[in-house]
Amino acid sequence: MLTATKPLVGGACAAPSSSARRRTFVVPEARRKPGNGRRTSVSKVGSTSTSTTTTTTTTLSADSNGAAVGTVTRPDVHVQDRTHATEMKATVTVHMSKAAGVRDFLYDLILKTWLHVDLVSSELDPQTGQEREPISGAVKHSGRVDDEWDMYEATFKVPASFGPIGAVQVTNYHHSEMLLGDIEVFPTGQEESAVTFHCKSWIDPSHCTPDKRVFFPAHSYLPSQTPKGVEGLRKRELEILRGTGCGERKEHDRIYDYDVYNDLGNPDDDNNPTTRPVLGGKEHPYPRRCRTGRPRSKKDPFSEERSHKEHIYVPRDEAFTERKMGAFDTKKFMSQLHALTTGLKTAKHKSQSFPSLSAIDQLYDDNFRNQPVQPEGGKLRFVIDLLETELLHLFKLEGAAFLEGIRRVFKFETPEIHDRDKFAWFRDEEFARQTIAGMNPMSIQLVTEFPIKSNLDEATYGPADSLITKEVVEEQIRRVMTADEAVQNKKLFMLDYHDLLLPYVHKVRKLDGTTLYGSRALFFLTADGTLRPIAIELTRPKSKKKPQWRQVFTPGCDGSVTGSWLWQLAKAHILAHDAGVHQLVSHWLRTHACTEPYIIAANRQLSQMHPVYRLLHPHFRFTMEINAQARAMLINAGGIIEGSFVPGEYSLELSSVAYDQQWRFDMEALPEDLIRRGMAVRNPNGELELAIEDYPYANDGLLVWDAIKQWALTYVQHYYPCAADIVDDEELQAWWTEVRTKGHADKQDEPWWPELDSHENLAQTLATIMWVTSGHHAAVNFGQYPMAGYIPNRPTMARRNMPTEIGGDDMRDFVEAPEKVLLDTFPSQYQSAIVLAILDLLSTHSSDEEYMGTHEEPAWTKDGVINQAFEEFKESTRKIVEQVDEWNNDPDRKNRHGAGMVPYVLLRPSDGDPTDGDPTDEKMVMEMGIPNSISI
């Protein structure tokens, strides 16, 4: 029996907050008894006269985003005595959409029987060999469960020959959609034997969707094991979800289909037409997104018309539902930020720099941590309200008045990096440390040859050999070894964005307010296990009018003050490049964009009865919705990302290049990613040995990976006794084929795609997806504001070229006022305000987040093997918490422990402590566990 432990999807139906200040409600039990808390039962279902009793173990799977899922050992809700009819009863919990008003409730809901439920047999009719006719019943209102949920009941006369109930069908004759909670079916008077259909899905009015909604009992079946009476329903349900590929999708649709990213621009906007290349296809390879079917642009036949509605289509149960009182309204917030970035295009002082480094500090409210959280949404609600009323006024302010306006409107929290050490951003040691313990720890790689070489065409981009020579290296490492010895001993590491960025340098430099170089940064691993930066190389390729320019900068350069300031400028440039690659590649591409095809394919090819669907589904929660919002306001033409990061309008195109050149599914598993970058090797025993022993992201991540992999392997071995069962699973193979051929169609012919032909390959594939959606995303997302919220630490823009490139007046200005040149290189005040606001939002956990190791699917509790496997997984996460805490307090681990150092907690699971992960505590955005899914 479902208990009040699982939140409804999104707002009005979200999980209870740990704070009493928030008003919440959860899915109620369909039948609740005083003092009966959580009721799980042994189902004893039979006629009341001569039947024998059949015992089945029954549990539920609380689907995380609106689909009906679950597991039972056998759903034997049937009449044992085949000579009698039995009266069966169904109880149903329903929440009506807020679109249905008080009048609807009083008249339609109480006085009319608008909800119908059909019982479907799991057996075929022995005489016809066809599916039995369902038994229908009108559901009548029986009372209120609470302020949000209503209880309905129906009775059925079930013939003795009907057999076990294999499914229920639901029809909504009301004119408003409803959220279906639970359906419980049991012989009248035998509630303790009830089997629950955990639905948790929006049911549209029959005039919108003529198909009856189907929900299965909770037993997980491979396709070959499906009861004969519901085989057809299982297949038809998947056909409905696949759709026909035609027509524009409506908000109430549940259809999953694929399309290219052809909706980022807006060619039809008469005031500000924008076009962006189509992402997906031979020219710009890319993962596919959800098809909306909107008409093509009138002015650009390759582009889809931009949505004129606030909502971009995603299948109904993937969308956020009504937001509960006080919850974060991300759509409205991002809409206001988008309006602000649009306004920046015409603001006469949009490029205004900060007047001093101390002025940046004024963005943050020193007393923030002592402020009470506002009762209706806290800081985010405050920002939304003020943005609505004071946006235009803000544009009119000048100088110090504008800075004060930003401070008053946004009231930013002091980022943790600045709160712990105000000078951390300036120190080279911290610059290096953040490459392995910051917000983008998956770009650094081992240097395996010297000189470092480019793979670009020399005729176009200049000499292949890097300007960072052996002499430069040996001078910087004080000749403790030769450059060749440093390579051989695995002492040299680098961030290498040279080949990725260099082809875009001239394009980006034509844009206002940004500049670009091809870049590399080289680091040396010291004897105490920490990294030290030793060189930064910046390159501008030749053009028709100018020869190639490139220069290597080193700490202190020539030992002069001027050289020290040039080094700080060079750091600002490569930090901006790293911030762009982090946001566009490590974050958006590798998690959000690449995951959407897995979700689409799973819903098209895997039945909700399928065990693999149930394993993966918690990891897909809200991802399609957040991606749709991103296409509308974050990654679109002229959106927040283009206005805030170095590549500007080429941002998404650049991520396409990275997808084409770098992305491989088999390398997305953490161990394989580390090996590819040279950051780890496998020893003869198959164990990983890290190139940097104290590598916080890898140390913690491998613990998380191992726990996920073992959980997936045990799960797979339980449902597939032998490898042949995997190969013969038609739904599983169709899912994986569609991921390759449709979801990632531009890479479908690559030889590295794994075959699902063994327990190991299947477990590795599933674990890779589960890791990307949980650990990988947590590592790149939730540290954004704590680390990048202080602009000098992680500037997202570099607006001014290096003075040594230009020379003349630029160099003279730099010598006279180096701090001003550095501030002119950092993002402007406008850009900073936008970046901080969006990073603050993205780094904040949802109040109804589901965390790895703490969210248990009820379906697993009554299956002995799966329940034990999950308990072991849960115990593994608890041990990871202890290990991470121990490492963060170990003075020998200098990359995560030290004076003023931000500890690495992004991959620290939740330990269940009631004070751990309080969504109302806005100082804890980094310390709330690892969410299962990409939900922000």
From Swiss-Prot:
<feature type="binding site">
    <location>
        <position position="781"/>
    </location>
    <ligand>
        <name>Fe cation</name>
    </ligand>
</feature>
<dbReference type="InterPro" id="IPR027433">
    <property type="entry name" value="Lipoxygenase_dom_3"/>
</dbReference>
<dbReference type="GO" id="GO:0009753">
    <property type="term" value="P:response to jasmonic acid"/>
</dbReference>
<protein>
    <recommendedName>
        <fullName>Lipoxygenase 2.1, chloroplastic</fullName>
        <ecNumber>1.13.11.12</ecNumber>
    </recommendedName>
</protein>
<dbReference type="GO" id="GO:0006633">
    <property type="term" value="P:fatty acid biosynthetic process"/>
</dbReference>
<keyword id="KW-0560">Oxidoreductase</keyword>
<dbReference type="InterPro" id="IPR036226">
    <property type="entry name" value="LipOase_C_sf"/>
</dbReference>
<dbReference type="InterPro" id="IPR020833">
    <property type="entry name" value="LipOase_Fe_BS"/>
</dbReference>
<dbReference type="GO" id="GO:0009507">
    <property type="term" value="C:chloroplast"/>
</dbReference>
<feature type="domain" description="PLAT">
    <location>
        <begin position="88"/>
        <end position="217"/>
    </location>
</feature>
<feature type="binding site">
    <location>
        <position position="592"/>
    </location>
    <ligand>
        <name>Fe cation</name>
    </ligand>
</feature>
<keyword id="KW-0479">Metal-binding</keyword>
<dbReference type="GO" id="GO:0034440">
    <property type="term" value="P:lipid oxidation"/>
</dbReference>
<feature type="region of interest" description="Disordered">
    <location>
        <begin position="264"/>
        <end position="308"/>
    </location>
</feature>
<dbReference type="InterPro" id="IPR042057">
    <property type="entry name" value="Lipoxy_PLAT/LH2"/>
</dbReference>
<dbReference type="InterPro" id="IPR000907">
    <property type="entry name" value="LipOase"/>
</dbReference>
<keyword id="KW-0934">Plastid</keyword>
<comment type="similarity">
    <text>Belongs to the lipoxygenase family.</text>
</comment>
<dbReference type="GO" id="GO:0031408">
    <property type="term" value="P:oxylipin biosynthetic process"/>
</dbReference>
<dbReference type="GO" id="GO:0016165">
    <property type="term" value="F:linoleate 13S-lipoxygenase activity"/>
</dbReference>
<keyword id="KW-0444">Lipid biosynthesis</keyword>
<feature type="domain" description="Lipoxygenase">
    <location>
        <begin position="220"/>
        <end position="936"/>
    </location>
</feature>
<feature type="compositionally biased region" description="Basic residues">
    <location>
        <begin position="287"/>
        <end position="297"/>
    </location>
</feature>
<feature type="binding site">
    <location>
        <position position="936"/>
    </location>
    <ligand>
        <name>Fe cation</name>
    </ligand>
</feature>
<keyword id="KW-0276">Fatty acid metabolism</keyword>
<keyword id="KW-0150">Chloroplast</keyword>
<keyword id="KW-0443">Lipid metabolism</keyword>
<dbReference type="InterPro" id="IPR036392">
    <property type="entry name" value="PLAT/LH2_dom_sf"/>
</dbReference>
<keyword id="KW-0925">Oxylipin biosynthesis</keyword>
<keyword id="KW-0809">Transit peptide</keyword>
<keyword id="KW-0408">Iron</keyword>
<feature type="binding site">
    <location>
        <position position="587"/>
    </location>
    <ligand>
        <name>Fe cation</name>
    </ligand>
</feature>
<keyword id="KW-0223">Dioxygenase</keyword>
<feature type="binding site">
    <location>
        <position position="777"/>
    </location>
    <ligand>
        <name>Fe cation</name>
    </ligand>
</feature>
<keyword id="KW-0275">Fatty acid biosynthesis</keyword>
<dbReference type="GO" id="GO:0046872">
    <property type="term" value="F:metal ion binding"/>
</dbReference>
<dbReference type="Pfam" id="PF01477">
    <property type="entry name" value="PLAT"/>
</dbReference>
<comment type="pathway">
    <text>Lipid metabolism; oxylipin biosynthesis.</text>
</comment>
<dbReference type="InterPro" id="IPR001024">
    <property type="entry name" value="PLAT/LH2_dom"/>
</dbReference>
<feature type="compositionally biased region" description="Basic and acidic residues">
    <location>
        <begin position="298"/>
        <end position="308"/>
    </location>
</feature>
<dbReference type="InterPro" id="IPR001246">
    <property type="entry name" value="LipOase_plant"/>
</dbReference>
<feature type="region of interest" description="Disordered">
    <location>
        <begin position="1"/>
        <end position="69"/>
    </location>
</feature>
